């Protein structure tokens, strides 16, 4: 009788269902996932146009890569920021790297990561004026910075809150504004106009045909150069 009870007890232990433990997750990974989800939720799906980028054609002109040819495929600003990569392909945005490039710049714009001029506030017909704001830093020194103000107003006439400090530009000497795409207008004044490819990420170029063909291309070039040298020396 006792041996029978021992056998039943042993069988019970063998066939007892095991509790499935939840996979352990590092606390840091959970925190990172929550932060990423929160950040993504906070970003607007459709960002607002800016004074320097008021519409689809301007956006596509700025980011370059000849994407402005596709401007008529986006009937609205909302369409530009909501179409999926499959929809872009159906509309004829080719090649695939052009779609990837457009999607990258869409995300940057959502995050407020603009190119040159993206932070400008006073823009008219795609042109912004940059002027020099002088301020006495000490009895012996005057600080000068480049600001964006309305074209028909002097810097002193514009309130402090309306003077937009422009990133990427500085004052050289006393009255010269220097920076990308800055066109001098007169002493202490420059203008910045929307230009094709202002924000473009420049692509690298393959040297000697790329990684796989490089050795072959360089070998053939060496053969041709040696042959030309022998011909020049009269060996042929």
Swiss-Prot record:
Name-wise, this protein is: Small ribosomal subunit protein mS41
Of the GO CC terms on this record, one is:
mitochondrion
- The gene behind this protein is fyv4
Q: Supply the alphabetized keyword list.
A: Mitochondrion
Task: Give the similarity note.
Answer: Belongs to the mitochondrion-specific ribosomal protein mS41 family.
- UniProt-annotated location(s): Mitochondrion
Protein's organism: Neurospora crassa (strain ATCC 24698 / 74-OR23-1A / CBS 708.71 / DSM 1257 / FGSC 987)
Give yes or no: UniProt keyword Mitochondrion: yes
Instruction: Provide the assembly information.
Output: Component of the mitochondrial small ribosomal subunit (mt-SSU). Mature N.crassa 74S mitochondrial ribosomes consist of a small (37S) and a large (54S) subunit. The 37S small subunit contains a 16S ribosomal RNA (16S mt-rRNA) and 32 different proteins. The 54S large subunit contains a 23S rRNA (23S mt-rRNA) and 42 different proteins.
Q: Which CDD domains match?
A: SAM_superfamily (cd09487)
Function, in words: Component of the mitochondrial ribosome (mitoribosome), a dedicated translation machinery responsible for the synthesis of mitochondrial genome-encoded proteins, including at least some of the essential transmembrane subunits of the mitochondrial respiratory chain. The mitoribosomes are attached to the mitochondrial inner membrane and translation products are cotranslationally integrated into the membrane.
């Amino acid at each position: 009788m006792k041996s029978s009870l021992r056998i039943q007890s042993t069988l019970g232990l063998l066939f007892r269902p095991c509790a499935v433990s939840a996979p352990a997750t590092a606390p840091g990974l959970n925190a990172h996932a929550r932060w990423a989800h929160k950040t993504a939720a906070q970003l607007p799906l459709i960002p607002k146009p800016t004074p320097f980028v008021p519409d689809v054609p301007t956006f596509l002109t700025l980011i370059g890569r000849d994407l402005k040819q596709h401007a008529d495929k986006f009937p609205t600003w909302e369409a530009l920021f909501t179409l999926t990569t499959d929809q872009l392909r159906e509309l004829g945005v080719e090649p695939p790297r052009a779609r990837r490039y457009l999607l990258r710049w869409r995300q940057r714009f959502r995050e407020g990561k603009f190119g040159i001029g993206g932070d400008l506030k006073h823009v008219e017909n795609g042109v912004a004026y940059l002027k020099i704001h002088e301020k006495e830093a000490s009895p012996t020194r005057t600080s000068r910075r480049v600001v964006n103000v309305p074209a028909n107003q002097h810097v002193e006439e514009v309130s402090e809150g309306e003077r937009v400090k422009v990133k990427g530009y500085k004052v050289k000497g006393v009255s010269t504004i220097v920076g990308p795409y800055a066109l001098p207008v007169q002493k202490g004044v420059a203008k910045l106009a929307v230009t094709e490819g202002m924000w473009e990420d420049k692509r690298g170029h393959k040297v000697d045909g790329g990684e796989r063909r490089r050795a072959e291309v360089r070998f053939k070039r060496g053969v041709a150069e040696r042959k030309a040298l022998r011909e020049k020396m009269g060996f042929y």
